[in-house]
Amino acid sequence: MNSKTADAIAIAYVVLYAAVIFFFPFDYSPVAEKTVKALFNSGEVVTNTFHWAGINFSKCFTDLEGLKHFGNVVSGFPYLTGFLKVALLATFGEMLKNRRRTGSWKTSDLLPKFIVWGLYGMLFSLVFALFAKGVEAISGTALWFGPRPFVYATASFWEKVLMGFSISFWTNLIFCYPMMMSHEWFNAVIKQRRFVGGSELLASLDSKIWGSFMLKTIVIFWIPAHTITFSLPPDFRVLMSAVLSLALGFILTVKPKAN
């Protein structure tokens, strides 16, 4: 396959992924012939089910119906959707980096890297929820400044930005660098096909990348990017998280230039 064809397929892949999210035809919500109000009045238990919701193109644009469906499914199945989102896009980001560096989309050990990215996606689903709820809980107390209680629907623009920054700051300060380092360890294990000890890993790291570049990405890119993400309405966060998954795969495959 020539490079132009591969590039066209890659572009189509990104467009298709975005379209699936924006026009997501499935939902995870109460479904019955009765309305939710009727179910409530009848005393029946209202439960969420995964079901086909169809595609209403006008509502997808005016009411973001597809994004809301996708958000409901993400909320209902956080680990499964976390695995798929990050595995699909971070792996693609890694392939994109390889395309830029070598001129080819071919990436070695693609399947194990896909699985590792997926496992990180599951971890992200848990960690981001922990930090978001944790920061909201201490906001406005002696532990941390900010609005209390924080209710997104009634919060002002600057309260949302402040909360987004607070969540982003603590997430990246505590979690980001160890996560990137652990991913580098997985890469070393996959590449060498054996267990890699801590001292061996540290000795192999490029000081310019891990002592400077990665730290700068946290301050210059990740904290601002996650501030925007956590400041957005929930329906838009799924799109932003998809873009950041792509960026993550791109950034974490940076290699030192040959002398």
Per-segment meaning from a language model:
Residues 10-37, 59:
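Alpha-helical transmembrane segments of multi-pass membrane proteins
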Residues 40, 70-88, 110:
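Loop-to-helix transition at the N-terminal end of transmembrane alpha-helices
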Residues 74-84, 159-177:
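Alpha-helical transmembrane segments
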Residues 99-128:
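Hydrophobic/aromatic-rich structural module bridging two neighboring secondary-structure elements via a short loop
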Residues 121-142, 165-193:
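Transmembrane alpha-helix/helix-exit interface in multi-pass inner-membrane proteins
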Residues 134-162, 196-197:
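Membrane-interface interhelical connector segments
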Residues 191-216:
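Membrane-helix boundary/juxtamembrane motif in polytopic membrane proteins
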Residues 220-229:
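Hydrophobic, membrane-inserted alpha-helices
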